[in-house]
């Protein structure tokens, strides 16, 4: 069996993409990679970086796709899922990383037994507050069954399509998907592997300030605020 890895990108820094390609090259198992690319025209021109060339050094042509699409993470992820060859899907952000070379393979195998799952979140920087936020994120999925995109959501394609995918949302597309799965009675399973995500937003805007802001926006979304309204405050 195999799995389709779907990654949305929009003007992603070249160094992030180079690191991400190296991460993919180190992963075990059979998988294809789909980049749902909404980057501005000519964004990478003159930057001495060619995503297709980098991928061609790692994968045979049938194992990767660069899919031009409209901006909007939900739209991009849905577009990637629509062209995925395999029944198993893993949605992975370009600023995420794995410490375990068998992480993608573990997600693929987990979908033999469960319908959807996620990895344990860890930040790329230490500190008591960031470690506590990561712990609370993992406990949130365990007890409330709400997973976010930076936790590496994986799911069977048939189930993903049955609940309507991510939908065309400017933000909170992962939250909406989790709520739909929760209403359908689907329980996320947690893998033992960590997924490492960037703490740059917390560092840039302040850890406490960012945490409070996110909780307020999630509360508003749960209580009927539109994704467009939330995006203006994000």
Residue ranges and their predicted role:
Residues 3-12, 27:
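A conserved hydrophobic helix/loop-capping motif in glycosyltransferases and polysaccharide synthases
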Residues 12-26:
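Short, well-formed alpha-helical segments that are part of the catalytic scaffolds
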Residues 14, 37-51, 96-97:
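A conserved acidic beta->alpha catalytic loop
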Residues 20-21, 30-41, 65-69:
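Short beta-strand/loop segment that forms part of the nucleotide-sugar
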Residues 68-84:
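Glycine-rich, basic loop-to-helix element that forms the pyrophosphate-binding segment
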Residues 89:
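Short aromatic/hydrophobic "clamp" motif used to bind/position activated sugar donors
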Residues 101-129:
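Conserved donor NDP-sugar-binding/catalytic core segment of glycosyltransferases
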Residues 173-180:
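Short active-site alpha-helical segment characteristic of glycosyltransferases
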């Amino acid at each position: 069996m195999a799995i389709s890895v779907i990654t949305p990108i929009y003007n992603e820094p070249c160094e992030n993409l180079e690191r991400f390609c190296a991460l993919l090259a180190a992963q075990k198992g059979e998988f294809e990679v789909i980049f749902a690319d909404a980057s501005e025209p000519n964004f990478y021109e003159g930057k001495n970086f060619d995503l297709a060339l980098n991928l061609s050094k790692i994968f045979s042509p049938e194992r990767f796709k660069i899919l031009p699409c409209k901006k909007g993470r939900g739209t991009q992820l849905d577009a990637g899922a629509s062209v995925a060859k395999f029944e198993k899907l893993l949605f992975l952000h370009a600023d995420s990383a794995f410490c375990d070379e068998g992480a993608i393979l573990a997600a693929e195998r987990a979908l033999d037994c469960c319908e959807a799952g996620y990895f344990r979140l860890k930040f790329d920087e230490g500190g008591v507050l960031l470690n506590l936020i990561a712990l609370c994120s993992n406990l949130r999925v365990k007890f409330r069954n709400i997973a976010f995109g930076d936790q590496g959501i994986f799911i069977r394609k048939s189930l993903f399509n049955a609940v309507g995918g991510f939908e065309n949302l400017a933000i909170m597309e992962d939250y909406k998907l989790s709520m739909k799965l929760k209403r359908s009675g689907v329980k996320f399973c947690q893998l033992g592997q960590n997924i490492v995500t960037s703490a740059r937003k917390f560092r840039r805007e302040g850890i406490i300030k960012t945490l409070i802001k996110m909780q307020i926006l999630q509360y508003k979304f749960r209580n009927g605020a539109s994704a467009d309204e939330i995006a203006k405050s994000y």
